Amino acid sequence: MIKLINILKEMVTPDEINQVDNFADQVLSPVDVDLSSKHVLDRLTGRESDVTFEQLIGFFTRLGQHKKEFIDFFERYNEIVATDRKSKLNIPFINLTNKAIAKTIMRKLNFLSDTPKLTFE
């Protein structure tokens, strides 16, 4: 049964990642979100990915509701982790001249990091 579920599970497509990237740019403007790193693409399009297009849109919708906090964090730190309690998704970002470059994406309830964390729901 588990194999059947894995076969039926839809992977996020590169086109959908592009759509999420554009959506994130809109809700977090003037910060430019970049989801194109190889590791992020591998995590989202790989067989073991449990992250859906809808969950990514939800993540950035909720993060957009905390845009001021996100920008404040981004102005203070070179790296931050955005953590969504609802989806349990964590995205570490590197701050490169007003560009938020996603390092990876993972679903983990108690994600541990020395990097400052912005948690939202």
Regions found by a protein language model. Name each.
Residues 2-121:
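Ribonuclease/tRNase effector modules and their secretory precursors
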